[in-house]
Each structure stands twice: as C-alpha cells, then as structure tokens.
Amino acid sequence: MEAIKDFFGSLMLREMLKGMALTGRYMFSRKITVQFPEEKTPQSPRFRGLHALRRYPNGEERCIACKLCEAVCPAMAITIESEQRDDGSRRTTRYDIDLTKCIFCGFCEESCPVDSIVETHIFEYHGEKRGDLYYTKEMLLAVGDRYETEIAAARTADAAYR
C-alpha cells in the first residue's frame, strides 16, 4: 500500500514541479523570435538569393551564351537559347530560370566566365501563381539594372575570397 502512495505522490507532485520549473526557465530566458517585416536578422555576405543578369557599363548585356551555367545546374532550372550576331559573337535570345526548381546552390554564378549571372541578397520575393517564379531574360536584366550598385559592391567585397 505504501508503494502505491509513493507512486501517486511522486507522479502528481514531483513531476508537476519539474515541469513547471522547466517552463519557468524558458519563460524568463531571452526570446529569439523576430517580428519579421519590421525587424530583420543579419544576412551573411555570401547569401544567395534572387538571380540577376548584369550588363557592362556601356549597356550591353554580359552573357556570351556559353551555356556553362545551364550545363552545371544540378536542378536543370536554367534554359538558354542563343544565336550568332552579324559581328560573329554569340548572344542569348532566351535566358530563363525556373525558381521553383532552383536550389540556390550558386554553381551558375561560379561557372560564369564573364560574371553575368549573379545571385543577389534579395530574399523577399514571391509569386501568387507558379508562373510568377519563372524569370525570363528581361526580368533578370531588370533585377540586375535595379540593384547593380549593391551587386557590384558585394562582388568587390567578396573578391578576395573567390
């Protein structure tokens, strides 16, 4: 009979106090929740976000249609079509990235010989439909044009580590 009393006493009181002590410890510890739109956590300098295509300072697009980024992409998210110009150089007629397939590994950025495709620090983008995350050449060039100063600064800061 004594064993039954000890069992219920320890089950009800001691275990309850242990649980409340644990709850109290977490209640008064430092909170780690961030109220996202108002507060932002620091980003790594090497964060890989939204893709962008860059241009040369004279306005010409950098991509020479070598298709290395398409070949190295493990998710097969990049589609490139190109044609020959009158001067003999190659340029892209189509450069699409399907962000629903992309795993943001950065291989496309590393393989590009002319530094055309880059991954920016932008992570706040969305799509209401699946097709909204399918970026065409014009959309990627627009992102590159809009954020060129930030992209150039990030590339310069990271140049020593490449």
Curated annotation (Swiss-Prot):
Protein's recorded name: NADH-quinone oxidoreductase subunit I
Organism field: Herminiimonas arsenicoxydans
Required cofactor names: [4Fe-4S] cluster
Binding locations of [4Fe-4S] cluster 2: 73, 102, 105, 108
Assembly notes: NDH-1 is composed of 14 different subunits. Subunits NuoA, H, J, K, L, M, N constitute the membrane sector of the complex.
Record lineage: Bacteria, Pseudomonadati, Pseudomonadota, Betaproteobacteria, Burkholderiales
GO molecular function: 4 iron, 4 sulfur cluster binding; iron ion binding; NADH:ubiquinone reductase (non-electrogenic) activity; quinone binding
GO CC annotation: plasma membrane
Main localization of the protein described in the UniProt heading: membrane
